[in-house]
Amino acid sequence: MKTVLAAAILFFSFFSTPAFSAAIEARIDLSRQEMKVYQYGRLKHVWKVSTARRGYKTPTGTWRPTRMYREYYSKKYYNSPMPHSIFFYGGYAIHGTGSIKSLGRPASHGCIRLHPGNARTLFNMVKRVGPRNAKVRIVR
């Protein structure tokens, strides 16, 4: 009986470890205009972001990255540069911005803007583990 109980505890503790969650998780809080980046369940970075300004929308939910580009230019907004883009839902992406003074308040057309250095760091973290092992979670 003790052997069965020990095996059951070991079995269930294995499935509750961070190995079964995303290796990299970017959690964006729209009300705080903040991103927290977790690596294997541990907080690694806290960064200011800019999300959708009035009249635009940043979606809420959880996704995996779908496409990644070191250099990308918006097809919708005047060929604007979007360095280190991580697309997660249609045309919505996390990317670097030249408008660093607006970080910490809503300013975008819906994407999540980061300081260019932070966008590069996140991009490289996701690239290292692969998009299938990363998660983007956006909450209000």
Task: Give, region by region, the residue ranges found by the protein language model.
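Positively charged n-region of N-terminal signal peptides that target proteins for export
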Residues: 1-4
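Bacterial N-terminal signal peptides
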Residues: 6-14
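Active-site-proximal flexible loops/turns
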Residues: 9, 36, 74
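N-terminal signal peptide c-region/cleavage motif recognized by signal peptidases
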Residues: 16-18
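A structural motif detector for short, solvent-exposed N-terminal "entry" segments of globular domains
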Residues: 20-54
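Exported/periplasmic cell-wall-interacting domains
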Residues: 21-23, 53-62, 69-140
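General beta-strand recognition
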Residues: 34-36, 64, 93
